[in-house]
Amino acid sequence: MADAPHIPDEAETRARWGDFEWTPANAIKVKEIIGRYPPGRQQSAVMPLLDLAQRQVGAETQTQGWLPVPVMEYIGAQLGMAYMRVYEVATFYTMYNLAPVGRYHVQVCGTTPCMLRGSDDVLAACKNKGLVKGHTTPDGLFTLTEVECLGACANAPMVQINDDNYEDLTYDSMSAVLETLAQGGQPKIGPQIDRQTSCPEGGPTTLKEMVSENHDYRGRWNQPA
């Protein structure tokens, strides 16, 4: 998490997470994940295990989850990795949170396409709702982070909130997304304007049948001319 301070390995953290272990359901998932790799290559499973652990911590704390030091040590021991190697992976990728976050982790893209298309307005909407970069709101609901490219440049500006993208945002639509979440609702995922995925704003110019239905054109491709 780019803007958040790293949580030190303090006694309170160890008291809370020192006895971390997989839930029965997640233990089955871990076995399946490690089984994807050849014998002796189990360390390749470190990324999906970190993600799974973060989600388990999130479920236990009713937040988006994070990775306390004892949890990373637990994963390292299971995979035969030094803790520092696990930590190196966790600190490289911004989808791993090294500090507690709120129920909704609001990640605002601030790179060039989003900046040119209005990411400052998106951040202003967040600020108006009481969100501060690198911090969690007092009610524990939102954590705001400014991140690098999230891969939806054609739909700039955009944010990722937990596992969902909200795209083609304005000040007003970002405010509405946050308000809906604060009220316990689920905003529309994806483009916040009248647009199908990343098609032109005026609508698609080809394959128009796919606008209203998941039309499968492959049957036509296989027909003789």
Where are these predicted regions, by residue range?
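Signature of N-terminal electron-transfer/Fe-S-associated modules in redox systems
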Residues: 1-225
